[in-house]
């Protein structure tokens, strides 16, 4: 079976919250693309099952008053990550946009990806505008 995709998602509704029973909404939340990325990150990571957020997860983040959010998407999803950052910043959520370069969280391993997450400062409006100007 040859495919250009690493993982092929089934054609079913994705409006679910991955690992919902394991999420602690009171501590920083990490949004990532897929389940393997969430497993590699481990710490309160929620997979989007794609590059965009589904309504159920968005409502849970806002409804549970998440205070700090890390967005960890692959480089090919930078415009999606910028859009998510902008959206959650508008709700007053401290948002961190983790730049992975050409790497993938599931390939980086637990220590490296978590160090990168830990080292990422919160976005401010200036940095968000820079991302929008140079990446979209």
Name each model-derived stretch.
Residues 40, 79-81:
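Extracytoplasmic/secreted cell-surface and envelope-processing proteins
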Residues 31, 62, 66-72, 81-136:
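Replication-associated primase and helicase/ATPase modules
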Residues 49-55, 74-76, 100-102:
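Short, acidic/turn-prone active-site loops that include or flank metal/cofactor-
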Residues 1-68:
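Phosphate-handling DNA/RNA-contact segment within nucleic-acid enzymes
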């Amino acid at each position: 079976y040859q495919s250009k995709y690493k993982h092929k998602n089934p054609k079913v509704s994705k409006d679910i919250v991955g690992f919902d029973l394991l999420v602690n909404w009171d501590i920083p939340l990490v949004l990532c693309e897929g389940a393997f990325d969430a497993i590699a990150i481990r710490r309160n990571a929620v997979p989007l099952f794609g590059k965009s957020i589904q309504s159920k997860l968005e409502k849970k983040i806002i409804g549970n008053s998440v205070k700090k959010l890390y967005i960890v998407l692959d480089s090919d999803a930078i415009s999606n990550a910028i859009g998510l950052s902008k959206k959650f910043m508008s709700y007053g959520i401290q948002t961190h946009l983790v730049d992975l370069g050409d790497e993938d969280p599931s390939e980086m391993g637990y220590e490296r990806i978590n160090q990168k997450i830990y080292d990422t400062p919160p976005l401010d409006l200036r940095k968000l505008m820079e991302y929008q100007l140079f990446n979209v």
